[in-house]
Amino acid sequence: MSPFSTPRVPVSLLILASLLVGSLHAAPEVIRDIEYSRPGGYSLTLDLYLPENPKGATAPTVVWVHGGGWKNGSKDKCKAAWLADEGYAVASINFRLTHVAQWPAQIDDCREAVRWLRRNAGVFGLDADNIGAWGSSSGGHMVALMGTLPYEENESISSRIKAVCDWYGPTELLTMPPNNVGNGRTEEDVANSNGAKLLGCTVKDCPELAKQASAYDQVSPDDSAFLIMHGDQDPGVPLQQSLQLHNRLQKAGVPSQMKVLVGAGHGGKEFETKESRELIRNFFDRYLKRS
């Protein structure tokens, strides 16, 4: 067994758990540590939050991608879990962090999670036609790319999503302050930045790769709908990163909403107020729920 392995959840137990959710429980339930992929023997898992829906109904699904600078964090703290109370299934995923693999492993994992959800939609009562994504910080960076990167034409199962909620994610790696010398940052600082660890090089040394990993540089008219939320006091990711993505999406004719949270920093309580949740719910309802 690989040293990276985690116990595989047998399919029979997954099916049983799914049936139990539908028949015994009156509230959203979570099935944890489901393996969705094993690239190079490295086990990738997700937690699946299932809503209480009428018998025979399928649930629109939102993939939650955690933050942590691509090097930290896990699926265990799922900011999107409350959507299960609103009729959504939520898949909170782990992906390969930068000490395990460099770009594009991270986006490959996100897309494979979507394919897994579609392959297993019938088992868990998911609506395979209505899948969105939501992430914060580096997770916001990745869900924005899930909604903008070109899709593989030869995909046997599509990784396409319909809607993206991007919380304060970097959208243009070339202009992110930690990736550039200046304002007290040295060449050594930049070489050790999260962006350099993600790409395996500095943005100065590999600008084309940085563009491939930047939603701002990947916008096209057929992109997913976007809701972008960012604090105007964010010390980590400049507000301009979100504003410029929003503007480019709109110029391309892509539906995009921009919500600037006054006084908010890099995350915080402002993103989880009743008003913020209502904005997010209404956004996903518009693009993922069947009329």
In which residue ranges do the predicted regions lie?
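Catalytic histidine-centered segment of alpha/beta-hydrolase-like enzymes
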Residues: 264-273
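Short beta-strand element of the alpha/beta-hydrolase
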Residues: 57-67
